[in-house]
Regions:
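Sec-dependent N-terminal signal peptides
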Residues: 1-10
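N-terminal mature ectodomain segment of secretory-pathway/periplasmic proteins
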Residues: 13-84
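Short, solvent-exposed helix-to-loop capping segments enriched in aromatics
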Residues: 23-26, 111-125
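Short amphipathic beta-strand/extended segments with alternating polar/hydrophobic composition
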Residues: 45-49, 68-74, 87-102, 188-191
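Gly/Pro-enriched, hydrophobic low-complexity segments
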Residues: 57, 61-69, 77-79, 125-207
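Acidic/charged, solvent-exposed loop-and-adjacent secondary-structure segments enriched in E/D, K/R, S/T
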Residues: 79-116
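Glycine-rich, flexible loop segments associated with nucleotide phosphate handling
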Residues: 109-112, 118, 159-164
């Protein structure tokens, strides 16, 4: 019995923690959270909502407080309300590639969901390694710290390393930090106030 306990304690939490996290997220119908991103362009704070098969809503807190973006996969367009919530006035209809609706690092609204983020991490993992460090806590929540690092000479969109902190129970990312080949931080993203499979109002993603 003691031997079985020791084996269980020393076994990896997941054979592939990134694939396990992605599988959990792919099983969700949607989620909402507060996203805090820090990079060379400063800080962005967004109240973010996602619903399958790809509906996205961003309510901006910083730097463009009050702006609202909604992406609908059925139209392939982003509706932008620069100064207020939808329903009060007509929004601008833009392509996802328009610079007005891209982040300071060039991220597109239609490629902003957590599943896409993890698939980007997997691209680095395919050309390198993933390892789980000692159990830790983030904001008082038990978490798995996973490091994904490309082999020398490899990079995916400048990124050669990701540090991820996954919620120990849900495997949902709580924080993701990316680094370039010089070891300099490209971006740090914190995901807070996470609500999985919420009941969105019927007009939450309406244009």
């Amino acid at each position: 019995m003691l031997l079985l306990v020791l084996v269980a304690m020393s076994a990896p939490l997941a054979e592939d923690p990134i694939a396990a996290s992605l599988a959990r997220i792919d099983a969700l119908q949607g989620y909402r959270l507060t996203l805090r991103s820090q990079g060379n362009g400063g800080e962005e704070v967004i109240r973010y909502s996602y619903q399958r098969p790809g509906y996205v809503r961003m309510d901006m807190e910083t730097p463009y407080r009050g702006a609202v973006l909604i992406y609908r996969p059925d139209t392939g367009r982003v509706q932008l309300w620069p100064f207020g919530a939808p329903g009060r006035r007509a929004g601008l209809s833009l392509r996802p590639t328009n610079r007005l609706v891209r982040s300071s690092r060039g991220h597109r609204v239609d490629q902003s969901d957590v599943g896409t983020l993890l698939r980007n991490v997997q691209q680095v993992q395919r050309h390198g390694t993933a390892r789980v460090l000692e159990p830790t806590e983030l904001d008082g929540r038990p978490a798995q710290h996973v490091v994904v690092e490309a082999e020398p000479g490899r990079a995916v969109r400048e990124v050669v390393r990701y540090d991820l902190w996954l919620d120990d129970e849900t495997l949902f990312p709580l924080r993701v930090v990316s680094y370039d080949r010089r070891g300099e931080r490209l971006e740090s993203v914190r995901l807070e106030n996470i609500d999985l499979d919420p009941d969105f109002p019927p007009d939450h993603f309406a244009p």
